[in-house]
A protein has these predicted regions:
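Intrinsic structural disorder
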Residues: 1-2, 23
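Bacterial N-terminal signal peptides
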Residues: 13-25
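Surface-exposed extracytoplasmic segments
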Residues: 27-230
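Bacterial N-terminal signal peptides that target proteins for export
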Residues: 2-15
Length: 230
């Protein structure tokens, strides 16, 4: 793929900002879906991450997760959807003159496809420091000294869905203020409703110099998905 076809409206957009000069890790999350988005799991974004690469300095990791199942629904999780008609885009806005203009300076595109044997693979386009790369899913592959991965992983998103439900329900009860047993409270045991749940992930390293364009170390990123029109 050297060019991407036109695609329909973006059903999901998540945004965060990060300073590459610090050991900052940030994420944005969206796990509660409308029926329309929930009906298209391959295009349903969950989180976007950016953090320093643990493999060494000079590299930053970007990640998009999608196709998760919101707790407390069925705990039967499937494999990564290999949908060639979905385009995943990681948008990068570089800081200029101390501010952001909310327009992407760099766009990393990702798309799945199958070879003649029916095996699923991922292609990434316009990766800072690597350009276009491709490889099989569920395998870490390398190009230009950077690492890439697409497949299923334990969902890193942490959320106490049971506590949230108890908190919301308490406000509907006469005389309750939300401070009830089982609700969100500081100092109380935490429950991770997404623990041991599969999430589909696209993960890629970027060269810091190419990521920032040699300018400010601060960037703002967001992710979108879109279906190819046809």
């Amino acid at each position: 793929m050297t060019a991407f076809p036109a695609f329909r409206g973006m059903p999901r957009r998540l945004a965060i900002a990060a300073a590459l000069a610090t050991s900052l890790s940030v994420m944005s999350a969206d796990h509660a879906e409308s029926p329309g988005a929930d009906a298209d799991p391959a295009a349903d974004l969950a989180d976007v991450f950016i953090f320093p690469s643990p493999q060494g300095s000079g590299r930053t990791v970007g990640a998009i997760t999608f196709a998760g199942r919101s707790a407390p629904r069925s705990r039967i999780d499937g494999d990564i959807p290999c949908d060639r008609n979905v385009i995943y885009t990681f948008h990068i806005d570089r800081e200029t003159g101390g501010s952001f203009d909310n327009v992407a300076d760099v766009q990393v595109h990702a798309r799945f496809g199958r070879n003649g044997r029916g095996e699923c693979g991922l292609q990434l386009e316009n990766v800072p420091g690597a350009g276009t790369v491709s490889g099989p899913i569920e395998t870490v592959f390398e190009a230009s000294g950077l690492k890439f991965f697409a497949g299923t992983r334990n969902d890193p998103f942490f959320f106490d869905a049971e506590g949230y439900a108890a908190l919301v329900a308490s406000f509907a009860a006469p005389g309750q203020s939300g401070d009830v047993a089982g609700a969100f409270r500081l100092g109380q045991p935490r429950r991770d409703s997404f623990a041991a749940r599969n999430i589909s992930a696209i993960v890629f390293e970027m060269d810091n110099g190419a990521l920032t364009g040699g300018g400010s170390s601060r960037v703002r990123v967001w992710a979108t998905t879109g279906r190819i029109a046809g």
